[in-house]
């Protein structure tokens, strides 16, 4: 790049970063497409570009950019992680497996290897028991909301309702609230084992999203009316 090219690149890079901050990945991609990234040496910048392409589901370009970044920084485990994920998105399981082998060489003690191993197993349509075994190994190392819920789902699919219930209860106890706790409550709802308090929490979160607000209010009022009628019936019986 000459001096003018560098200045133009600096301006465009600033625009890209601003668009990424606002999660306008389509807008960012329009600028990204106007630049020859083979001439860029900054690994962080290349990784941002790779993520922009991935966000727009242009996985071929994303993979090419991540490979450029990897060649600039061959010990970058995070780049390898994304190369594995993008390769899986493209259905290139054998390449993902090769990248995974490299990942284990540079990050053999990283618990994330279990997540990657699980994603590869899932892409290979491995048995539910195999997928469960991998996530159980991960859970022994690290207890996280997302992957605990994923494991609970696998238990549910495998028909092991007791393990599913136990794990959902463990998640609710440890994390109390949040996206995956609500998903755990949804699993319990499917099994018909919500407690009274959990049912109230579940309905407050999910019913307004599943049906129009006015219908949700109508259901709540109907339930209140039923409760009131039930209470009055008991009072009447007590006075007889």
PLM ranges: what are they?
Residues 2-3, 33-40, 67-74, 101-108, ...:
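Solenoid-like repeat scaffolds
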Residues 4-13, 38-46, 72-82, 93, ...:
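Generic helix N-cap/helix-start motif at coil->alpha-helix transitions
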Residues 22, 56, 90, 124-125, ...:
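Structural motif corresponding to the intra-repeat A-B loop/turn of tetratricopeptide repeats
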Residues 51, 82-91, 98-140:
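Alpha-helical adaptor scaffolds
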Residues 161-179, 186-196, 206-207:
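TPR/TPR-like (Sel1-like) alpha-helical repeat modules
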Residues 229-236:
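Conserved small/polar residues in nucleotide/adenosyl-binding loops
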């Amino acid at each position: 790049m000459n001096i003018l090219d560098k200045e133009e690149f600096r301006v465009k890079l600033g625009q890209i970063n601003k668009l990424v901050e606002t999660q306008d990945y389509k807008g960012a991609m329009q600028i990204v497409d106007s630049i020859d990234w083979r001439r860029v040496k900054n690994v962080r910048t290349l990784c941002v570009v790779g993520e922009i392409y991935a966000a727009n589901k242009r996985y071929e370009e994303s993979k090419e950019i991540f490979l450029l970044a990897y060649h600039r920084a061959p010990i970058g485990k995070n780049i390898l992680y994304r190369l594995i994920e993008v390769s899986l998105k493209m259905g290139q399981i054998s390449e993902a497996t090769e990248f995974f082998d490299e990942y284990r060489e540079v990050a053999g003690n990283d618990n994330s290897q279990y997540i990657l191993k699980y994603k590869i197993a899932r892409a290979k349509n491995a048995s539910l028991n195999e997928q469960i075994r991998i996530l159980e190994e991960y859970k022994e190392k690290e207890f996280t909301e997302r992957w605990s819920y994923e494991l609970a789902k696998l238990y549910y699919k495998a028909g092991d309702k007791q393990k599913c219930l136990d794990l959902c209860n463990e998640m609710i106890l440890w994390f109390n609230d949040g996206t995956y706790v609500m998903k755990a409550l949804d699993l319990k709802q499917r099994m018909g084992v919500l407690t009274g308090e959990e049912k109230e929490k579940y309905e407050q979160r999910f019913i307004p999203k599943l049906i129009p607000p006015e219908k949700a209010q109508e259901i709540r009022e109907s339930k209140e009316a039923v409760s009131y009628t039930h209470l009055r019936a008991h009072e009447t019986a007590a006075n007889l």
